[in-house]
A protein has these predicted regions:
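Short loop/edge segments at beta-strand edges and connector loops
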Residues: 65-67, 142, 188
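Residue-level signal for inorganic ion chemistry
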Residues: 18, 43, 54, 94, ...
């Protein structure tokens, strides 16, 4: 897999299927696919285009997309298959996107023999791409990323926490216990939080996921 070619496909798809619709969606363009989970016509169009182009790049590969999975949960079995599989979240942060906010991302992973071989996150607003290849490293817009050192003081660390852990940190702060890290407001977009973690803007992330 040529990582740059995949990056180009992601960028071109965002330009054609996503960006023309930011702040341009009507109520009919947005629906609730499950309780609290939204999908827009941009999500569906982008996933369809990415799927087509990825399968053209690698004939015989399969696609597990967030929106196709919502319609057919049995597709999750593809994640455990031995063949090449593309996993796509066409718009991570759909709620933000549906409200015309700029905090959203496109996320793609490539699996083979049941293991993640590469992954891409693209910020269509900043036109920034971060990607990683198993055993080789990670890059953002061509610049190799390195792991930040562990020498920072705890009160210099900032990150994103879930409700439970955020409440516990708030109690520590209210009690005047020091030192403590800084909690930032949730982006409501994991992809953008992942990017800022990779770029060293955030030092920790914590989530609690429940498959629906």
């Amino acid at each position: 897999i040529n990582t740059q070619s995949i990056s180009t496909i992601i960028i071109e798809t965002a330009d054609s299927e996503i960006m023309p619709l930011i702040q341009a969606l009507s109520e009919d363009d947005i629906r609730e696919k499950s309780q609290g989970e939204l999908v827009t016509i941009a999500d569906i169009a982008a996933e369809k285009e990415l799927s087509r182009r990825f399968m053209d790049v690698l004939p015989g590969s399969a696609v597990l997309g967030e929106e196709s999975f919502a319609d057919d949960p049995a597709l999750m079995e593809l994640a455990a298959s031995q063949g090449p599989v593309w996993i796509i979240d066409p718009i991570d942060g759909t709620k933000n996107f549906s409200k015309g906010k700029s905090c959203f991302a496109v996320m793609v992973a490539f699996l083979n023999q049941g293991k993640v071989q590469a992954g891409w996150i693209y910020d269509p607003i900043a036109r920034k791409t971060c990607y990683a290849v198993a055993g080789e490293g990670a890059w953002c817009d061509g610049k190799r990323l390195t792991v930040a050192g562990a020498g920072q003081a705890i009160d210099q660390l900032q990150g994103s926490l879930g409700n439970k852990m955020g409440k516990r940190l708030g109690e520590v702060i209210d009690a005047g216990e020091h030192p403590h890290p800084v909690q930032v407001q949730r982006y409501r977009c994991c992809g953008r939080e992942y990017m800022d973690l990779a770029l060293g803007k955030l030092q920790f992330l914590q989530y609690a996921f429940h498959l629906k």
